[in-house]
Amino acid sequence: MKTLRRCLFVFVLSLFSVAPDLAAADLPEFRPALLSRSPRSLVNLINADSLMKRGQKDGLLMFSCYVSTSGRGYAMQVYRCSPGSELLQKEVLGRIKEVEFEPAVYHHNPIDVWLSGTINFFLANGKPHLRVLLNQEEQDLKSGSDFVAPQFAFARGNPKFQGIYWPPSAPGHEAAAAVVLDVDTTGKVTNSKVAYEHPPGLGFGAAVAGPIRDAIFIPGFRNGKLVPCHFTWTLLFFGPGLQMKSG
């Protein structure tokens, strides 16, 4: 697996829920957080013309952010950034306070999720182009397939999941860990395996791969249909205390 590169990130995560006044019967059983169709969608807020004029060449980055039940985005992180993508990184991180998503749904109710995706900026025929995909799988990114990877759900009433903490050997240490997960069509994690950790040997991979087996995800969707998924999920560690907890 290619080396994960932690670039620039902002992570002031507040875990809170605001339940909108929506009838559960009007919502599907599962729906991932999606790009909205409003002017404040992430793909509409990123100013591709300005990026080209300021000298941004082809660039790619992966991102994660918290999406609330109101559809607001928070705590954007960017990583695995291609060389020379600094202007794109700054543009993406600067838009998180404005962006709106279509909120996720779990068992017919809106739910907060941790969403991951990829942003690809490229120039073709002298014009800028921007693609925002809600997965980070190499083959799906190459093909541009309609795949929304499973999203970590901040689901209440799941006492088995006790959260993800720093390993005892490295409390408060900045780090990155990637795990390969299998998630079924109910959102249950059926398998997890460490794919990468940096710095190595301090237990960050195991600190994610073990607890995440008890977490709940919004299942993955391919071509609009629920599918079991085998995918890579990345978590960055920084700041003191708990990294991820669902309640």
Where are each of the predicted segments found?
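Bacterial N-terminal signal peptides that target proteins for export
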Residues: M1-F11
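Bacterial N-terminal signal peptides
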Residues: V10-V18
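Charge-biased low-complexity segments
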Residues: L22-G247
